[in-house]
């Protein structure tokens, strides 16, 4: 039986532990484990690489999120970077406060998206690893499509909470 969630039904999902990718790219000197320096035609970026069941490349943006044009250019270049064998989803993260993150997402194979649950989890986990956010504290993740809440436990288990919202409706002939 699959549960049906209608508009504004709160949902919670417990993900497996956030994991770090094995070493695959030049490490950033003095940086935390999982950090890497990835260079593209648009510049070099200090990133945090994580797995939330799928690969994520988290780019801290202390000065603000990239513009739509920068998101497209940088997101595509990082998602297809040779360091990622099968590509990676890319999250650009602007820490608004220790309990709030603004995030833009570039999904491998899809491009810019309004929201991404695993991306929100990766963004929060990366900011916890960087010491910007804290474990066991709800972290509000602001995405273009809405707000999700992520909590990282002491053992790196990730809990994602948010509303199930209808984005569109349609019919399919089978």
Which residues does each predicted region cover?
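Active-site proximal loop and beta-alpha junction motif in alpha/beta enzyme cores
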Residues: 1-114, 124-174
